[in-house]
Regions:
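Short active-site oxyanion
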Residues: 36-40, 62-64, 162, 222-223, ...
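Asp-based phosphoryl-transfer active-site loop
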Residues: 4-19, 96, 237
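Short, acidic loop-to-helix structural element flanking the phosphoryl-transfer center
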Residues: 19-36, 85-92, 146-150, 201-215, ...
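Short, well-ordered beta-strand core segments
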Residues: 6, 66, 106, 243-245
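Conserved acidic, metal-coordinating active-site core of Asp-based
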Residues: 99, 103-105, 110-227, 231, ...
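Active-site phosphate-binding/coordination module
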Residues: 23-130
């Protein structure tokens, strides 16, 4: 069957190592849209952090869509209308945030405007590429203002699309099962990078949200080509008629 939709993960896939869209990639994706193909960006990023990239790809002009928060939210980019929005309840989010206090991780949550963290000075990850200010990186990438709440669980008063935790890669590999264990029946969790582990509502992932969106668009899975590199892309690449794992993809 002919391809009717292109789905692109963002970090590690659409973007270069400098976090930019290369001119060649931009030209190819705009040309594909001009030919009638639907372009869908699918990311763990918040919606606000995806919009500038969608603008660069002229997606508003060609009826493109954004799957943000690993599929918890689906938005038509041109109208900014939410077609799907699934959150973790406030009470369950509070339980998860309380549970995270016993681990050496950096939880990050957000609303439309602010990103909230326990301690703005507890931000450094020691990666192979050097020390990395993860809070600055994440707030800038999501176009958020930064706000410090010393007790996220106690202060939280709204449901969340996603709970993001950052940590040293070796530490997360060792403890991610213990972090997830109490909530396996109530939420979905996945790595989006070696230093990111993310919670979304139960049965939320990129594949399920893509299936709902493409059904509305009248596009079959066999007519979709998807590109990704992370653990959180696995279901999407399996679901699409053509799934392409990037050269830098994690082994699965």
């Amino acid at each position: 069957m002919a391809i009717k939709a292109i789905v692109m993960d963002i970090d590690g896939t659409l973007l270069t190592s400098e976090k930019k869209i290369s001119p060649k990639t931009r030209q190819a994706l705009v040309a594909a849209q001009k030919q009638g193909l639907s372009l869908i960006l699918a990311s763990g990023r918040p919606t606000n952090g995806m919009r500038p990239l969608a603008d660069e790809l002229e997606m508003a002009h060609y009826n493109g869509h954004l799957l943000s928060y690993n599929g918890a939210c689906v938005t038509h980019h041109g109208s900014q209308q939410q077609l799907f929005n699934q959150t973790i309840s406030k009470s369950l989010s509070q339980q998860i945030l309380e549970h995270l206090k016993q681990f050496d991780v950096i939880p990050m949550i957000n609303d439309e405007t602010f990103m909230y963290v326990n301690d703005v000075f507890h931000h450094t990850l020691h990666l192979e590429t050097g020390d990395f200010n993860i809070i600055e990186y994440e707030s800038r990438g999501g176009n958020f203002q930064l706000c410090e709440w010393h007790d996220l669980a106690a202060r939280l008063n709204f449901p969340l699309n996603k709970i993001l935790i950052a940590g040293e890669p070796a530490y997360l590999q060792k403890y991610h099962e213990a972090i997830y264990a109490p909530f396996k029946e109530t939420v979905t969790a996945a790595f989006s990078a070696p230093f990111y582990f993310e919670f979304t509502a139960k049965n939320i992932d990129k594949a399920r949200s893509l299936e709902k969106l493409t059904l509305q668009l009248g596009i079959a899975a066999e007519e979709v080509i998807a590109f990704g590199d992370g653990h959180n892309d696995y279901t999407m690449l399996e679901w699409a008629g053509t799934g392409i794992a990037m050269e830098n993809a994690v082994e699965e």
